[in-house]
Amino acid sequence: MGDWMTVTDPGLSSESKTISQYTSETKMSPSSLYSQQVLCSSIPLSKNVHSFFSAFCTEDNIEQSISYLDQELTTFGFPSLYEESKGKETKRELNIVAVLNCMNELLVLQRKNLLAQENVETQNLKLGSDMDHLQSCYSKLKEQLETSRREMIGLQERDRQLQCKNRNLHQLLKNEKDEVQKLQNIIASRATQYNHDMKRKEREYNKLKERLHQLVMNKKDKKIAMDILNYVGRADGKRGSWRTGKTEARNEDEMYKILLNDYEYRQKQILMENAELKKVLQQMKKEMISLLSPQKKKPRERVDDSTGTVISDVEEDAGELSRESMWDLSCETVREQLTNSIRKQWRILKSHVEKLDNQVSKVHLEGFNDEDVISRQDHEQETEKLELEIQQCKEMIKTQQQLLQQQLATAYDDDTTSLLRDCYLLEEKERLKEEWSLFKEQKKNFERERRSFTEAAIRLGLERKAFEEERASWLKQQFLNMTTFDHQNSENVKLFSAFSGSSDWDNLIVHSRQPQKKPHSVSNGSPVCMSKLTKSLPASPSTSDFCQTRSCISEHSSINVLNITAEEIKPNQVGGECTNQKWSVASRPGSQEGCYSGCSLSYTNSHVEKDDLP
């Protein structure tokens, strides 16, 4: 497809020149032709179309267009449109047959191209639809892959959980097997122990049977009796049986059975009596603890050592009751514990009653306020309540006794009772061991408390001795300071001691019967002391000494005042305790004399309680 210039005749117009130049300069190719055909087909059919096609070939450039077409067709492999000329100078002529054949071939090619184009378009549509289908399938498969991955992850997690559960179950199974093995070993050991105990019991039973047989036979041999010469027949007229080995063995068995039944009956009665006594003692102990339970004290009352010991004893007994049950112990340990606890409670009750008596006597003689003393009506009400509680307790004890009798009335077989007793022997042994260790600990604690109590008693004795020495020196000084003696104003006021012959001045009684004279005063507000001693010489053994000591204290000082009044002391009662002893000490708060007197009184009361124990 060349760039060639056509030779135009000079007669051609300018328009044909431009067309020939355009066609000669452009590169013509089948693709360009096809594009031109498409463009031509796309142009709407109008007058411009006719003008466009007529612009290529006109009447002026027919030869040029034919030559151009011939050249193009030859380049595409079509035969030439001109006939072959014989001479060079002769003009070539147009071959119409060749032109028609070329046109036909061009039309065939056009149809083929159109069919191929349609086929390509249909194939393209098919491929597009296939592509869409494949894309949809791809998206679906991708979603299925994601879901399958999620399901696989869930299944893996579930598999892991199941494996963990399986491992735990294997571990539990192993533990259960170990526990079963341990239990089997324990059962085997207990079975061997039970067989051993059974054999031991059988040996003991055989020994006891032999011992009983020996005792019975020895009694028969040693028994002094008379032989009957003329045997009197039986009342029913039957003849007595001969004594043979079988009859003697049968009689011995019957005798053993009768003896064993008697022993069992007696043992049941003794057990019933022990149970009843245990219940009665336990009820008594509970009632005593409830009676002696520490009440709320008034703020005016002072707490002394004796009340502290009472509260501690009650708390210890309550702790013992909650710690162990009396029914599980043996008779000896129960008896010892109950007797000790009842003795303690009895001491506490005795001291409590003595304190109440002392309080009542103090109220009557010293004129305390009615608020600090229990009234008679309250006392009677309390006694009535206690009587009602005692009646209720008695009824409860009766009902318990009836229930116990009903339970024990149901007779059990000897074999079952023996088996039950044998079963509980091991538990009783273990319980006894534990109780023995607890008893040892209690004994150690008791010894420790006893040592501390003895040390406290020794300290109290030393303090008391020092106080007695100080008081003796003070009394000696007061006695030496006595200067005036007045025999006319002496009254029947007698000095005595609660324990005559001892130096227990805490039990002295203070009581002034008549108003005393005013003491002499000293200038500048100094304390004035006036002491009068009236002494009458004994004319006969029945006369007694009269003494009055009075210490007068200045208005500005607040020291202790001790007024002493004594009753007549008989000569034959020297060294013994005096009756109707009352004491009262009016002291300021913080005075040492009142504290020492209270300590000595509690100490003497505790000694009296120990001496009065049953």
UniProtKB/Swiss-Prot annotation:
The modification Phosphoserine is found at S290, S293, S312, S536, S540, S542. Widely expressed, with the highest expression in brain, intermediate expression in kidney, testis, spinal cord, liver, heart, lung, skeletal muscle, ovary, fetal liver and fetal brain, and little to no expression in pancreas and spleen. All specific brain regions showed intermediate to high expression, with highest expression in amygdala. Also expressed in fetal tissues, mainly in liver and brain. Pfam families: ADIP. Keywords: Cell adhesion, Cell junction, Cell projection, Cilium biogenesis/degradation, Coiled coil, Cytoplasm, Cytoskeleton, Nucleus, Phosphoprotein. Residues 131-227, 266-293, 374-460 form a coiled coil. Belongs to an adhesion system, which plays a role in the organization of homotypic, interneuronal and heterotypic cell-cell adherens junctions (AJs). May connect the nectin-afadin and E-cadherin-catenin system through alpha-actinin and may be involved in organization of the actin cytoskeleton at AJs through afadin and alpha-actinin. Involved in cell movement: localizes at the leading edge of moving cells in response to PDGF and is required for the formation of the leading edge and the promotion of cell movement, possibly via activation of Rac signaling. Both the N-terminal (up to position 79) and the C-terminal (from position 304) sequences are required for interaction with SSX2. Belongs to the ADIP family. This is Afadin- and alpha-actinin-binding protein.
